[in-house]
Amino acid sequence: MLELKFVRNNPDIVGRALVNRNMGTELIDSLLEYDVAWRKCLTEGDSLKHKRNVVTREIAQLKKENKDTLSKINEMQDINNRIKEIDDKIRDYKSKINEIMLSIPNIPSETTPVGKDENDNPVVRVVGEKKKFTFTPKPHWEIGEALDILDFERGAKIAGQGFTVYKGLGAKLERALINFMLDVHTRQGYLEVFPPVLINEKAMTGTGQLPKFKEDMYLCCADGYYLAPTAEVPVTNLFMDEYMENLPVSLTAYTACFRREAGKHGQDTRGIIRQHQFNKVELVKFVKPETSYEELEKLTLDAEEILKLLKLPYRLVTLCTGDLGFSAAKTYDIEVWVPTQEKYREISSCSNFENFQARRANIRFRTPEGPQFVHTLNGSGLAVGRTVVAILENYQREDGSVEIPEVLRPYMGGVEEIREE
């Protein structure tokens, strides 16, 4: 969340940021209108309360002198009624201001390129060579079904479209990737945590999922809990309403993730690229403001390391303003090569939120000058299902079998390949 004082004093900067994000400036216009009315009511309320104090003293003096107090008591009643009206307006305006403030996205960093959509995302680097097949490669869903390691029909039978059952070596591959990723990241210095995946509304608001993305979340209506859309939410909120010590703090976590938007608008309706339930390993950092962009580079390299070890070709792009997430100031997307689609697909987003999430979640640290909000960062390290997609497609052989990347074999009990039985 932005600071109200900053928005009030810099409407042009905030308005330009919204325009660069392909948004209008109506939110800012409404906010400033409510802000003026709110502050006017505060001033009027203070004046009335001062007047009430004066009348209170006058009534006391009249009583002391045994004089009639009826007119002053009536005046006091009128003042109290007016104060109640003003206080109601103050609460109403403040509620409207808070609602708008929670709906204003972060301001893109100066190094975030201005652009309309993903077509304007500049490529930072390309790593690894795309495999040249001597045969026509098959899409991962055909491979998964032929090898009997992915069962889309039974997943749909149990829960509906957008859910998949992993079987046999498919399930083992998914589990192997989770353990492999966590081992790599803990060696990189991240502390592993295993958080809840049922999240309360306050925590969801703290990281920016609410109120904007409420329709994309799964809600347990009876209890008011949301299913975690990403481990970013519970891990970041571990320090909600706290002062942090010994920054930076680096955490990694595996969780199942749940999102309602899978397959929206007809995208990726086949396979496991977009699912309502999927596994992900997350990286989260809490850092001092002056080091946050250096830490973003480190976090991104830490996520990239997984693909390097798996020997999967990928590229790194910087998201432009029109493609930037709601809470982010700057984001790198890591995109893995998917041969049958002949394009790179996002497998991780690594973002610096500056103090946007910390202000919402009230996560601070102490300095000699006074409390400051920390900067938060996170990135997928990686999306596990999409890594399975990349392995099945990039490591497939002409006979239909799939080679297991060498670094995963110890996690697979020595299995070197998956082939049809």
From Swiss-Prot:
It is an enzyme of class 6 (ligase). InterPro entries: aa-tRNA-synt_IIb, aa-tRNA-synth_II, aa-tRNA-synth_II/BPL/LPL, Ser-tRNA-ligase_type_1, Ser-tRNA-synth_1_N, SerRS_1_N_sf, SerRS_core, tRNA-bd_arm. It is found in: Cytoplasm. Catalyzes the attachment of serine to tRNA(Ser). Is also able to aminoacylate tRNA(Sec) with serine, to form the misacylated tRNA L-seryl-tRNA(Sec), which will be further converted into selenocysteinyl-tRNA(Sec). GO terms for cellular component: cytoplasm. Keywords: Aminoacyl-tRNA synthetase, ATP-binding, Cytoplasm, Ligase, Nucleotide-binding, Protein biosynthesis. Belongs to the class-II aminoacyl-tRNA synthetase family. Type-1 seryl-tRNA synthetase subfamily. It catalyses: tRNA(Ser) + L-serine + ATP = L-seryl-tRNA(Ser) + AMP + diphosphate + H(+); tRNA(Sec) + L-serine + ATP = L-seryl-tRNA(Sec) + AMP + diphosphate + H(+). Consists of two distinct domains, a catalytic core and a N-terminal extension that is involved in tRNA binding. The keyword Membrane does not apply. It comes from the Archaea. Its EC number is 6.1.1.11. It holds the Pfam family Seryl_tRNA_N. Gene3D superfamilies: Bira Bifunctional Protein, Domain 2 (3.30.930.10), Serine-tRNA synthetase, tRNA binding domain (1.10.287.40). Homodimer. The tRNA molecule binds across the dimer. One of its GO terms (molecular function) is ATP binding. One of its GO terms (biological process) is seryl-tRNA aminoacylation. ATP binds at residues 259-261, 346-349. Transmembrane segments: none annotated. Pathway: Aminoacyl-tRNA biosynthesis; selenocysteinyl-tRNA(Sec) biosynthesis; L-seryl-tRNA(Sec) from L-serine and tRNA(Sec): step 1/1. L-serine binds at residues 230-232, 282, 380. Its main location: cytoplasm. This is Serine--tRNA ligase.
